[in-house]
Structure formats: structure tokens, C-alpha cells
Amino acid sequence: MEQTYQYAWIIPFLPLPVPMLIGLGLLLFPTATKSLRRMWAFQSVLLLSIVMIFSMNLSIQQINSSSVYQYVWSWIINNDFSLEFGYLIDPLTSIMSILITTVGIMVLIYSDNYMSHDHGYLRFFAYMSFFSTSMLGLVTSSNLIQIYIFWELVGMCSYLLIGFWFTRPVAAKACQKAFVTNRVGDFGLLLGILGFYWITGSFEFRDLFQIFNNLISNNEVNFLFVTLCAVLLFAGAIAKSAQFPLHVWLPDAMEGPTPISALIHAATMVAAGIFLVARLMPLFIVIPHIMNLISLIGIITVFFGATLALAQKDIKRGLAYSTMSQLGYMMLALGMGSYRSALFHLITHAYSKALLFLGSGSVIHSMETLVGYCPKKSQNMVLMGGLTKHVPITKNSFLLGTLSLCGIPPLACFWSKDEILNDSWLYSPIFAIIAWSTAGLTAFYMCRIYLLTFEGHLNVHFQNYSGKRNTPLYSISLWGKAGSKISNKNLNFRLVTLLKKKKNGRPSFFSNKVYKMDENVRNMIQPFLSIPNFDNTKTYLYPYESDNTMLFPILILILFTLFVGFLGIPFNQDVDILSKWLTPSINLLHQNSNNSIDWYEFCEDAVFSVSIASFGIYIAFFLYKPVYSSFQNLDLINSFVKMGPKRIFSDKIKNAIYDWSYNRGYIDAFYGTFFTAGVRKLAKFTHFFDRRIIDGIPNGVGFMSFFVAEVIKSVGGGRISSYLFFYFSYVSIFLFIYYFLNL
């Protein structure tokens, strides 16, 4: 066992050769590297699979022995400062490692087909492998300095993948938004790290926790300063895990490819913030005010994310706000001190959300054959519906993921979310009411997404179904670059037909006008496509199921969604695998903790939570099931008959909720009005002050010196007669003034 732990340092570095070799290959042998591009995908999956097997071996040993292993190398040593690098293998590390590798492998396999059309295929796999390396390095770090280094690398990889299609302005802006928002949190994290080093004199977790606890017990610290440093550390987690109010980057991050959305939302970037709080829990738990703040931010995010998801029309944005809300549940659990419940929900949510995102990617992939490669169309649930008979495997997998997130037993998220909901009653009745109510909202909006996507009729064929014409549609090239409008005459092959007149004169979603692609782009993608002849025009009237390469990871994630929840079911102490796994960490936080459970109380709470979820599902079916719904704008309430004043009142409520969700709770508008505009005004004032005041004073002095010098120069001409004239003139003026003053 000791030998296995000694080689654990290699875990973060195993996926690293792939991006390095891809970079060298593209630099030195570009043609050969591109021709063998499938080989790089295989190597990425193979190396990450080795890490997964290694992580599973470590986890099994930890479950059996409840051990924690740390090894460090001294990097800098002197009398005043020492810096060590190493790795820490504990239950939190092993859980995160398995989560990262299993989800990462599924996403890599899925991406091989999903990204096959993209000329950035190799770049994508290089980024993904480096992303895995960064996240694995983060979870194995033994001190705050390593945490910060890999924290920044995780952020960098996220920015690269969010802006993967950087030629699209909206993707570039989303990347910038994620970068700027996370800079706020990262700066706070850095200040917090420096603050706690100033207090304790150590970056190592074990030494830091021990020294800090001794200082707290002896009352040798300034609690105000300690709380400030803890808040700064927590700010990093707020930004990275998209917690209120630094959540604004998360929905815009959907501009990246769908596979990376699955990885970010399941096991990497947003999970990093939860991991950081869990890692620093022994530090936070002795500071009551910071624990209250963590739970407060968590419950606000829970409710806020759920309300923003109510009326989203973009399938990926709806899932993004769902992630935000579920991360709020995890943060709430950590703030309440429910360490086990938070990590349990992190595990179950990761597999369920990965399943949902890969399922949405399959839907988007099938819709692109109808509406073109345009995210605003292929991700728009307004144009979906009726996909059940066209993509049955995707539909069933998405349904399972939806029911899991709704909290329906025996699926994964039911067990973990139910623990958090039960613990919330013990912490705060107000928080409990909000958390339980949001569980109903979660069931509502997730069922809404499912119904709009798969039930009813394929709305892409009924463009004027609601009585309103859609805005003009535009083409997006395969690489995400904005294409030309329909009127562009320089296009040269048919991609999809739109707005075609039927025989009865009614407009449908198809037309005789065509989209075409530039010749150079066609030449780039031809070798990578499975279509034998790209010149042959083939228009699909209906979506079709994805290839087996994309379906295989979805089917594996279905198994995880069905069975991973049984890891944490507390039947008894011997069967509760998760509690045995987390024994060292739980004992560190709660000495002599008792994991026994009252099954009668558990079943009573479970019936209540399932009833709330079922009520949310029923409301969604009532409003969005095709037999009732008129699909008028696909808003929240769209099926009530006219009822006079009551209908007017319900319309006001509907419009208010829709505006709240569509405008993202007005947080983005608030930031744009006050922060962005304020920074610009401050910049203009600073520019004016710098140019007119700071530069104006020395420039004015220089100008006056020049003017005086010119006057003196004109006076001093070198003629004695001039000197005598000025001399007698000044004497005369002086005598004249003196005479009049003495009168």
C-alpha cells in the first residue's frame, strides 16, 4: 500500500504528454499530426483511463484502511521562509480524482465524434487533456501555493475552451466575461492565502490547520482580520463555482462546445470552488461568521439559479442555471457543516449533469441537420419538440437525468439532495423552506426542458405556429465563425433550406434560398467528415439519432445515474461505503460522529420531498404537455383560457417571471449600469486628471519658463545704449512712485 501512495505524484502528469506532443507535432510535423489525429484522441482516453484505475486503487485502499498520505519536497529553505511542494492523498482527493477521470473519459470519447467536423479537433483534445492535468493537480495539492497555481491553470483552460470558437464575437465576449469575473475571485483568493500565511506562517494544510486551531483556542488572533481573510478565500470559491453574485459568467460559458460544458459543469471548473471550501473546512468551521456566510450565499444561489432557469429557451443555458442552483445546495450543505452530504451531492450531480449535457449535445447535433450550425437555432427549444420518435435513446437518457435532478427515487440525486434538505431543517427553518420550495422549482424547470425538447411536434416545421414571425435567420460556419446573411451571393454549397412556401401559401421553416460555404473551408473539413461527397445536397426533414461513439458515453452515464447513489445510502455502518470512505475527514471535523439514521424519519422526509418534486412535475406537464399547451411564445403560463381580470393578473405574473428569467435577474444589467459604466467614467476622469492636472502643472511651468526666458532674451540685446535706457527708465518710474506715495 505504501508503494502505491509513493507513486501517486504521477497522477496529475499522466495526461500531460498529449498536449505537449500535439503542440510539438503541429509545430514540426503539421501534416502528419493532422492525418493521425484520431490517434491523439485514443492516447487522451488511454492515459486518463490509467489515472482512473490508479485513483480507484487508492480509493479502495482508503476505504479499507481509512488512511491519509502526504509527501512533500522542500523547495526553498532559510531561517525566515520555507516552501514545500508535494501531494496529499485523502478521501477528498480520491473522490475528486475518480470524478474527474470517469467524467473526463466519457467526455473525451463523446467528443471524438461530436468534434469530428471541426478543424480545431486537435486543439480541442490538447486543451481537454491539459484541463484534466490542471484539475488533478488541484485536487492532489498539499498546500495553498500549489492550490493557487493549479487554480489559475484550471481557469486558463476554461477560458480557452469557452472561447474555443473565438472567431465568433459572442464566444470571445463570453471568454472575456468569464476571465474578468473570475479575476475578482482569484484576487481575493490570493489575498486570503497571504493573510493566513501572515497569521500562521505556513502554507501546508496540516500545519496551517493545527497552528490556526491553537491560535483560536488560546485567543491569540484578531477575529475581525481572520474573518476578512476567510471571506477573501471564500471569494475565490464564489467566482469559480458561479455562486451569487459572481455567477454571471456561467450561462455565457455555454458558447463553448457542448462536451466542454459537460466537463465544466460536472467535474472540473465549477467543482473546484466546492472542492476548495471542502478542503479548507477545518479552517472555516472554527470561524462561525464565515460558516454563516457560506450557507447564506448557498441558499441565495439555490433559489436565484432556479428562478432564472424558469423561462430559458436555450437548452444549455437552462441546464447552466440548473448547475448554479445545485452548486448552491452543495455550498449550503458545507455552510451547515454537512460535509458528507455536500460531497455526496457533488458526486451524484456530476454524473446526472454530465448525462444531461451530453444528451443535450446529441439533441443539438441532430437539430443542426435541420437549422444549420447556429447555436441560436440548434439550441433553441422553441424549434424543438417531438424528438421522442427521432432520437429515442437520447430521449430516454435525458429523461433519466431529468428525473434524477428532480429528486425522484431511486435515482442518484434523490439520495444526496434529500440529505441536504433534511439537514436544512436542523440548521434554519427559513433556509429549509427556501430549499424545499426550490426543489419543487427544480422539478418544474427540468421537466419543462424535457417536455419542450422531446414532446409534442417538431416545431422547426411550424415557424409561424404562435402567430408571430421569427427574426431573420443567419448561418454559422462549422468553426463557429459568423457566416453571411441569406442574401450573400458568394456562397457555394447548400447547407440547409429555410422558410419554404407551401402550396397553400403558408410559410414553413424551409425555403428555396440556400446557405453555402467558402471553398477553402470545404477543403479543410473534407477529410474529417463521414459524408463521402460534400457537393451532393442532402436536406434532412427530421433529426436522427447520434452515432454509437456519442451514445456509448451516454449509456455508461445512465448506469452511474442509476447506481452511484447507492454508495451513500446509510442502510447500516457496514454498507455505507461513502461514510467509510470519508471517515478520516469526518473524524477531523466532527469527533465521535454518529452516522446512525432513523429510517421512519427518513421515509417520512422522502415522501415529503418526492411529493414536492411530483407537484413541480405535474405543473410542468399541465402547462407544457402538448395536449394542453398552445405554445404561445413557450413562456411559463401559456395555456389558460381567457378569464377576464383573472387572466390579466395571471398574464402580469407570467410576464414578470419571464422578464426576470430572460433578463437574468437584472444582475447583468446592474453590473453594466453601475460597474461597467462607473469604471468607464472613472477611466475618463483619470485620463482627464492625468492629462490636464498631473501633466498640466509641469507643462505649465515649462511654458512659463520658456515665455519669461524669451522676454529676457529680447531685453538683453548686448547694446550699452539699451541698458542705459532701461536703467534710467526704471529709476524714473521708481522715483515717480516714491514721490506720489510721500505726498
Curated annotation (Swiss-Prot):
Q: List the catalysed reactions.
A: a plastoquinone + NADH + (n+1) H(+)(in) = a plastoquinol + NAD(+) + n H(+)(out); a plastoquinone + NADPH + (n+1) H(+)(in) = a plastoquinol + NADP(+) + n H(+)(out)
User: What are this entry's molecular-function GO terms?
Assistant: NADH dehydrogenase (ubiquinone) activity; quinone binding
Give any Pfam family that matches.
Answer: Proton_antipo_N
User: So where does this one cross the membrane?
Assistant: 9-29, 40-60, 89-109, 125-145, 147-167, 185-205, 219-239, 258-278, 284-304, 327-347, 354-374, 396-416, 425-445, 551-571, 607-627, 723-743
Membrane topology summary: Multi-pass membrane protein
**What is the E.C. number?**
7.1.1.-
Tell me, in one coarse class, where this protein mainly resides.
plastid
Superkingdom: Eukaryota
Query: Which controlled-vocabulary keywords does the entry list?
Result: Chloroplast, Membrane, NAD, NADP, Plastid, Plastoquinone, Quinone, Thylakoid, Translocase, Transmembrane, Transmembrane helix, Transport
Q: Which GO terms describe its biological process?
A: ATP synthesis coupled electron transport; electron transport coupled proton transport
Q: Where in the cell is it found?
A: Plastid, Chloroplast thylakoid membrane
Whether NAD counts among this entry's keywords is: yes
Gene3D superfamilies under this entry?
1.20.5.2700
Which Gene Ontology terms of cellular component type are present?
chloroplast thylakoid membrane
What family does the database annotate? Belongs to the complex I subunit 5 family.
The record's NCBIfam families line, in alphabetical order, gives: NDH_I_L (TIGR01974), PRK06590.1 (NF005141)
Query: What subunit structure does UniProt give?
Result: NDH is composed of at least 16 different subunits, 5 of which are encoded in the nucleus.
Q: What does this protein do?
A: NDH shuttles electrons from NAD(P)H:plastoquinone, via FMN and iron-sulfur (Fe-S) centers, to quinones in the photosynthetic chain and possibly in a chloroplast respiratory chain. The immediate electron acceptor for the enzyme in this species is believed to be plastoquinone. Couples the redox reaction to proton translocation, and thus conserves the redox energy in a proton gradient.
Q: What is this protein called?
A: NAD(P)H-quinone oxidoreductase subunit 5, chloroplastic
What is the protein's species of origin?
Ambrosia trifida (Giant ragweed)
Task: List the top taxonomic levels of the source.
Answer: Eukaryota, Viridiplantae, Streptophyta, Embryophyta, Tracheophyta
